[in-house]
């Protein structure tokens, strides 16, 4: 599953949320799929929500209809109200900020390029991280670091994320997907 809006640093639009939601449904329903790899195009994992696109008016009407039909679709896409029954591996390059860090927390195995950066930048904009981080992050890393990230928008490097257990592997930049595929081969 590739988040593919590199010109927007893979910021999540309503259309992308629908597409990711549908990918999770396919993963669960297709017996030929044994696991998934979530990555981003163009050297960035995901920079969060595209706040301009979220205002509406720019998306395909069929996608907007689906968002209206399934009220928590965006939470399911971000793996907040959804837990795929098969393993999900994250292959992170570059930024995993805001919604990028939130969806990351719903994955099972996490690989990152050595210059990747993680963080919940919502507090810096006067926003609240609604994708589940207030619960999941403090369960996955030490409470004091989770609190600092949640309250201040502090960013952490790949090295620090590895030290605290937010990710499991660091590789040379440009090789996260390759490592994720190696892990997927062992699973499948």
Predicted regions and their residues:
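Well-ordered beta-strand positions
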Residues: 109, 148, 152-154, 160, ...
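Conserved CoA-thioester-binding segment of acyl-CoA-metabolizing enzymes
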Residues: 1-41, 55-57
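Glycine-rich beta-to-alpha active-site loop
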Residues: 77-125, 155
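An acidic, glycine-rich surface segment that forms the CoA-thioester-binding/catalytic face
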Residues: 17-21, 25-29, 51-93, 135, ...
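Alpha-helical segments flanking ligand/cofactor-binding loops in enzyme cores
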Residues: 79, 101-102, 135, 147, ...
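Hydrophobic/aromatic residues within transmembrane alpha-helices
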Residues: 38, 50, 103-105, 161, ...
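C-terminal long alpha-helix characteristic of the crotonase
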Residues: 6, 111-116, 167-188
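Short helix- or helix-capping micro-motifs
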Residues: 47-49, 92, 137, 145-154
């Amino acid at each position: 599953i590739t988040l593919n809006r590199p010109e927007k640093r893979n910021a999540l639009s309503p259309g992308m949320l629908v597409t990711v939601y549908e990918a999770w449904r396919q993963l669960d329903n297709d017996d030929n799929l044994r696991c998934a790899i979530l990555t981003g195009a163009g050297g960035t994992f995901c920079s969060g929500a595209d706040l301009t696109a979220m205002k509406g008016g720019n998306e395909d009407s069929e996608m907007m209809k689906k968002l209206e039909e399934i009220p928590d679709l965006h939470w399911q896409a971000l793996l907040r109200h959804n837990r795929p029954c098969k393993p999900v591996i994250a292959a992170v390059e570059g930024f995993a900020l805001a919604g990028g860090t939130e969806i990351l927390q719903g994955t099972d195995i996490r690989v990152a390029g050595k210059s990747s950066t993680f963080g919940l930048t919502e507090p810096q904009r006067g926003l609240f991280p609604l994708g589940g981080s207030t619960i999941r992050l403090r369960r996955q890393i030490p409470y004091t670091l989770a609190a600092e990230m949640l309250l201040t928008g502090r960013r952490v490097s790949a090295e620090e994320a590895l030290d605290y257990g937010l990710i499991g592997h660091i590789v040379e930049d440009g090789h996260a997907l390759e490592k994720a595929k190696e892990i997927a081969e062992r699973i499948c």
